[in-house]
A protein has these predicted regions:
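GST-like domain detector, emphasizing the conserved glutathione-binding G-site
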Residues: 1-88, 102, 178
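Short secondary-structure boundary/hinge segments and terminal tails
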Residues: 28-29, 148, 168-170
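Extended, non-catalytic scaffold segments that flank or surround catalytic motifs
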Residues: 32, 142-143, 171
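A general structural signal marking secondary-structure boundaries and capping sites
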Residues: 32, 105-108, 155, 164
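Short, hydrophobic secondary-structure boundary micro-motifs
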Residues: 35-40, 62-63, 111-114, 139, ...
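Short, solvent-exposed alpha-helical surface patches in well-structured domains
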Residues: 47-50, 146, 159
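GST-like fold's C-terminal all-alpha helical module
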Residues: 55-153
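Acidic/histidine-enriched, glycine/proline-rich intrinsically disordered or flexible terminal extensions
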Residues: 164-179
Length: 179
């Protein structure tokens, strides 16, 4: 369906296939504009896109790939042993990113401003994956933890918290809204 052979892919009723998470999200925001997940004003939209890019590129490379890729995917796919230097780097980088999330939410209600946006959803998706393997040091990043608790408590996010990977259960706090 996707010439690049990647997910996600959204297939519309007429058979049109859209690929790429940002493309799909912006398409859905255009088709279902209320409430907007990108933002209404150009600067707000730009800030949302900047943060989506931050998490999908920078956070993904510096944290998600180093922790989930090394600790989980290598084991799950029986590829090789985790590279401990990569895992250590992922843990160190995680603190930097949680500090940045804390910085943002100490100044704004949500990551990109006063409204929940795709930036919050993107960041929460990455963090949820890492939280599933128990590698988010929430206790030393209270503002980020409070922001994530608000995301976790949203009805639209809760189904994600009940997903489990066979033979790899999440830590007890994973689905707890008051972690």
């Amino acid at each position: 369906i996707n010439p690049m052979g990647e997910v996600p892919v959204l297939v519309e009723p007429d058979g049109t296939a859209l690929s790429g998470s940002q493309v799909i999200c912006e398409f859905l925001d255009d088709v279902h504009p209320e409430p907007t997940l990108i933002g209404k004003h150009p600067m707000h939209r730009a800030e949302t896109r900047r943060l989506v890019d931050w998490f999908d590129r920078k956070f993904n490379v510096e944290v998600t790939e180093k922790l989930v890729g090394e600790k989980f995917m290598k084991r799950f796919l029986a590829l090789s042993e985790p590279d401990s230097a990569q895992v250590r780097a992922g843990h160190q980088n995680m603190h930097t990113h949680l500090d940045y999330i804390s910085y943002l939410v100490e100044r704004r209600k949500w990551l990109a401003g006063d409204e929940l946006t795709l930036a919050d959803v993107t960041a929460a998706a990455h963090l949820s994956t890492i939280d599933y393997i128990g590698d988010v040091p929430w206790d030393s990043h209270d503002p980020a933890k409070e922001w994530y608790a608000r995301i976790k408590s949203r009805p639209s996010f809760r189904p994600l918290l009940s997903d489990h990977i066979p033979s790899a259960p999440p830590p007890k706090h994973y689905a707890d809204l008051d972690f």
